[in-house]
A protein has these predicted regions:
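Beta-strand-rich domains and repeat architectures in extracellular enzymes and scaffolds
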Residues: 2-37
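Short, conserved, GDST-rich strand-edge loop motifs in beta-rich repeat architectures
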Residues: 73-83, 122-142
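Surface-exposed loop and turn segments in beta-propeller and other repeat-based domains
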Residues: 1-9, 55-56, 151-176
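Residue-level detector of Asp-centered blade-edge/turn motifs that repeat once per structural unit
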Residues: 22-24, 65-67, 112-116
Length: 176
């Protein structure tokens, strides 16, 4: 387990989205139920070792490595009708948050371009399954956020919102 010794070992956890550092020696995963990001040392792949975890102030939905940083899509929504989220930049070696960037909606996933210069964040603003049996459309709609990166870090000036409404024949007002 990757939980600290003083944590309830029976608490629910889940290594949902997994990424690897550029050297391939460390796995980093989002743990939504525990509101944390975990690290696994795989320098010896036959003997992986827990390498710690960092608790967060929200639900991590996705992780992606950019250079020596890990980008964390963090759901901070107050409710389904008041979605919120941030993109965190964490130094991999020090496991410390360097930056937080408001995304304006509930992120679902993050991916980094092969050259490490752009992160794409899918803003889902997930629907409420209890409303109208979860049928779409449901406001607010989602979108794509493109973020310019410099050495793996988010640059506030380089944030671009790309609307996705109107692209689908089914529920064109809801890009979820």
């Amino acid at each position: 387990t990757n939980l600290p010794a003083d944590a309830d070992q029976a608490s629910p956890t889940s290594a949902e989205i997994v990424t690897a550092t550029q050297d391939g020696m460390t796995l980093i995963y989002s743990d939504s139920p525990d509101k944390s990001v975990g690290f696994v040392d795989i320098a010896d792949p036959k003997n992986p070792k827990a390498a710690g975890m960092v608790r967060l102030e929200g639900e991590p939905t996705s992780v992606a490595v950019a250079g020596q940083k890990v980008l964390i899509a963090l759901n901070t929504s107050k409710s389904k009708v008041d979605p919120g989220g941030v993109l965190l930049t964490m130094d991999v070696a020090g496991k410390a948050i360097d930056k937080s960037c408001d995304l304006g909606g509930q992120p679902d996933s993050v991916a980094v371009s092969p050259d490490g210069s752009i992160a794409a964040v899918a803003i889902e603003n997930e629907r409420d399954e209890d409303v109208n049996d979860g049928a779409i459309p449901q406001a607010p709609s989602g979108w794509l956020t493109l973020v310019t990166l410099a050495d793996g870090a988010v640059t506030e000036a380089g944030i671009k919102r790309v609307e996705l409404t109107g692209l689908s024949e089914v529920a064109p007002d809801d890009a979820e």
